[in-house]
From Swiss-Prot:
It is a multi-pass membrane protein. It holds the Pfam family DUF92. It comes from the Eukaryota. It is found in: Membrane. GO terms for cellular component: membrane. The keyword Membrane applies. Belongs to the TMEM19 family. Keywords: Membrane, Transmembrane, Transmembrane helix. It comes from Xenopus tropicalis (Western clawed frog). The lineage of its organism: Eukaryota, Metazoa, Chordata, Craniata, Vertebrata. This is Transmembrane protein 19. The chain crosses the membrane at residues 19-39, 49-69, 86-106, 224-244, 250-270, 313-333.
Length: 336
């Protein structure tokens, strides 16, 4: 009987904690709304943000980060970074948020997938694939900055990508999509390619066969995976556009978002591989049979110089795609 009472008490405390947290979130979102109303009153150029958008922008990242901590996809520093990035992208544009959410959830699943296989060739493999603040900001920092610039230019809200009517805002939307799709493509390629590929990877600079896990090594399976990874982000963005953007029938077609997402994933993976081959050290540790990213006495040199680490390579490749994708899209985007 005593055990039953203890269980009931624990459930009651848990329920009350959830209620208290929800009330705090409501208070925070309403406080932000009051501040935005006050700011828009004294500045005619600012549009007030609805309390519903404030609530979604505060509540949703908290739920996702809590889920990430529970599933060991984020450590404590990564959780704080994820809260900031998630809040900025959600309040700026729901399409931004859906693209980020798709990248985070699928990439987290893939990082944990076949972990026992990845341990055999990756000396830096982490159990659970927990992301820290550095990884969060290398993948989400640029999109967060672009989302802030988007809000300065256009204000919070969803718009159709239409270069003829909203050139700057559309440029930023495609740039953000490119950054996230590039990160997704690289993640899919590095997590799926080495596991499923039946052939040895080839170094992208010399096309020589290299051990599995070598920085700069590519396989057909990995390249196809990167295309699918970028496409998944593009599909998420496109579907959100269909749901939240009004008057799409009088705007430029939005379906190219999916195609450009796939292109960003593939090209981002190729750029990442090229940078990794020349600016990341790869060596084969004969004592462990694993790839190492730093020179050691036991490591046999394969390629690259110890200039950048994996996070820096990811950041540089996403920046390049973020600059190239909207430039290409502007030239070929269908116009009414």
């Amino acid at each position: 009987m005593l055990f039953i009472q203890d269980d009931v008490y624990k459930e009651y405390v848990k329920m009350m904690m959830n209620i208290v947290i929800l009330c705090m979130i409501l208070c925070i979102s309403l406080s932000f709304w009051i501040i935005s109303i006050t700011a828009s009153t004294y500045s005619g150029s600012l549009r007030p943000i609805s309390p519903w958008r404030w609530l979604v922008s505060v509540l949703t990242p908290i739920i996702i980060v809590w889920h990430g901590i529970k599933k060991r996809s984020l450590d404590n520093s990564g959780a704080l970074g994820g809260l900031l990035v998630g809040f900025i992208l959600t309040i700026a544009n729901y399409s931004f948020f859906s693209a980020l959410l798709t990248f985070f959830f699928i990439s987290s699943k893939l990082t944990k997938w076949k972990g026992e296989v990845k341990k055999c060739y990756d000396s830096e493999y982490k159990e659970g694939g927990q992301r820290n603040w550095v990884q969060v900001f290398c993948n989400g920092g640029l999109p967060a900055e672009l989302a802030l610039l988007y809000m300065i230019e256009n204000g919070p809200g969803e718009i159709p990508i239409d270069f003829s009517k909203e050139y700057t805002a559309s440029w930023m939307c495609l740039s953000l999509l490119g950054a996230l799709a590039s990160s997704a493509g690289d993640t899919w390629a590095s997590e799926i390619g080495p596991v499923l590929s039946k052939s040895s990877p080839r170094l992208i600079t010399t096309w020589e066969k290299v051990p599995v896990g070598t920085n700069g090594g590519v396989t057909p399976v990995g390249l196809i995976s990167s295309l699918l990874g970028g496409t998944s982000v593009g599909v998420a963005y496109f579907v959100t556009q269909l749901i939240f953007v009004p008057d799409l029938e009088i705007a430029a077609p939005q379906w190219p978002i999916v195609i450009y997402g796939g292109m960003a994933g593939l090209l981002g993976s190729l750029i990442d591989s090229y940078l990794g081959a020349i600016m990341q050290y790869s060596g084969y540790d004969e004592s462990t049979g694993k790839i190492v990213n730093h020179p050691t006495k036991e490591a046999k040199f394969i390629c690259g110089k110890p200039i950048l680490d994996n996070n820096a390579v990811n950041l540089f490749s996403s920046i390049l795609i973020a600059l190239l994708l909207p430039t290409a899209a502007w030239s070929f985007w269908p116009r009414l």
